Amino acid sequence: MTVQKDSPAVRVARAQVEAWSNHDLAAARVAVAGNATLAVTTTQAETPAVNTVVSTTGIEDYMAGLENFVKSVTPGSLKEIAALGDDRNALLMFTVEADYGSAKVTLANTRLYLLDEDHKIMAEQVVYFVSS
């Protein structure tokens, strides 16, 4: 299959991002496979890298991290910049607004997804930075 802006994998990834960015954690959870891996990185030194293996740490650990993150995200602030994918791979680029208490900031994200044969997210790689 060729790379498309609205491929099957893009639709799954987009639905998961739309869910968590609107604080719908139940819908976000449904999209994640039981053997998923998550890697989060940024070049900003004050934010630690995150690596989670759901089959080792459990979906509850993944969801606890996601819930902690989305508490600061402003619902409805998702702005998609680009999306490409095929049947199993998706690449999304977007921003969300977040408020960490001192001021609202913009989180610029690029997320790479790999889906399993059941169309669930089995690998997610997040690269982001915070901008005021």
Q: What does each of the following model-derived ranges do?
A:
Residues 3-4, 8, 64-132:
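A beta-strand edge to alpha-helix "cap/lid" segment located at domain peripheries
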